[in-house]
């Protein structure tokens, strides 16, 4: 199959169209692609060095690694597993410190995930000053702890990540307690003057879940009562039949005496 190079030559063709006057306006992506042009070499080269760990993947196996301990012989022929394509062409995984801090924080604070999030895409150029935890226009959440930890590491306030994380975490606790206390005071003051608050989205969800649980409990109790009633009726009928038989047996000798 012939290699398709149309997408690679898009910068050259667009430049020709601009010079010839076929395009009146420069595309928005033109300067970006001109600064970072696409790769024109289509041959796959093995990635022998891991960019994250720096480990070299092209080392050959040592002969002692091919020794079979059971037969005391060396493996000299390639098997099916050895003939498989090595992972030298596979791109390395991207690992970031922020992801480790996020997973650690939300593993220790799972209830922070229940707080509502604003799913609005931003421009990515927000300039926050992480010398303090609170930011204008950004709610206090786990991301604040992550960015505050990175700032403490970069500024040199702490050399160890855990120490910086602990300081950011304690600052988060203090601000969260202050925020909850202010919300509680405002709620009590508003209630005192006659304000009525509707249930939140989380409370509404819990109420609907509790209704389902109550209905399930009623069905289970009714089923257990029905099963116990069937068992009792069977035992009672068997007991009545036994009593009637005993009465008949005791009545027959009396009739003979008469």
From Swiss-Prot:
Domain of life: Eukaryota
Segments of skewed composition (Polar residues): 230-239
Region (Disordered): 230-258
Molecular function (Gene Ontology), one example: structural constituent of ribosome
Listed transmembrane segments: none
Compositional bias annotation for Acidic residues: 241-258
Compartments, as annotated in UniProt: Mitochondrion
Classification via Pfam families: MRP-S25
Keywords recorded for this protein, A-Z: Mitochondrion, Ribonucleoprotein, Ribosomal protein
InterPro entries for the chain: Ribosomal_mS23_fun
A cellular-component GO term for this protein: mitochondrial small ribosomal subunit
Family recorded in the similarity comment: Belongs to the mitochondrion-specific ribosomal protein mS23 family.
Subunit structure and binding partners: Component of the mitochondrial small ribosomal subunit.
Protein known as: Small ribosomal subunit protein mS23
């Amino acid at each position: 199959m012939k290699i398709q190079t149309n997408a690679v030559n898009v910068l050259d063709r667009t430049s020709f169209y601009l010079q010839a006057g076929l395009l009146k306006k420069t595309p928005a992506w033109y300067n970006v692609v001109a600064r970072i042009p696409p790769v024109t070499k289509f041959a796959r080269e093995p990635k022998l060095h891991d960019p994250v760990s720096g480990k070299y993947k092209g080392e050959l196996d040592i002969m002692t690694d091919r020794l079979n301990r059971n037969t005391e012989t060396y493996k000299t022929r390639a098997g099916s597993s050895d003939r498989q394509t090595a992972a030298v062409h596979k791109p390395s995984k991207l690992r970031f410190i922020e992801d480790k801090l996020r997973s650690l924080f939300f593993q220790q604070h799972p209830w922070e995930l229940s707080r509502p999030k604003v799913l609005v895409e931003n421009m990515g150029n927000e300039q926050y000053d992480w010398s303090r935890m609170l930011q204008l226009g950004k709610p206090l959440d786990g991301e604040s702890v992550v960015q505050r930890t990175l700032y403490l590491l970069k500024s040199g306030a702490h050399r160890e990540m855990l120490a910086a994380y602990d300081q950011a975490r304690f600052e988060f606790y203090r601000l969260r307690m202050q925020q909850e206390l202010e919300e509680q005071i405002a709620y009590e003051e508003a209630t005192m003057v006659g304000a009525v608050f509707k249930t939140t989205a989380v409370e509404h969800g819990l109420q609907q879940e509790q209704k389902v649980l109550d209905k399930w409990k009623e069905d289970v109790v009714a089923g257990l009562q029905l099963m116990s009633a069937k068992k009792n009726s069977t035992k009672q009928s068997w007991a009545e039949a036994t009593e009637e038989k005993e009465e008949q047996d005791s009545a027959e000798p009396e009739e003979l005496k008469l």
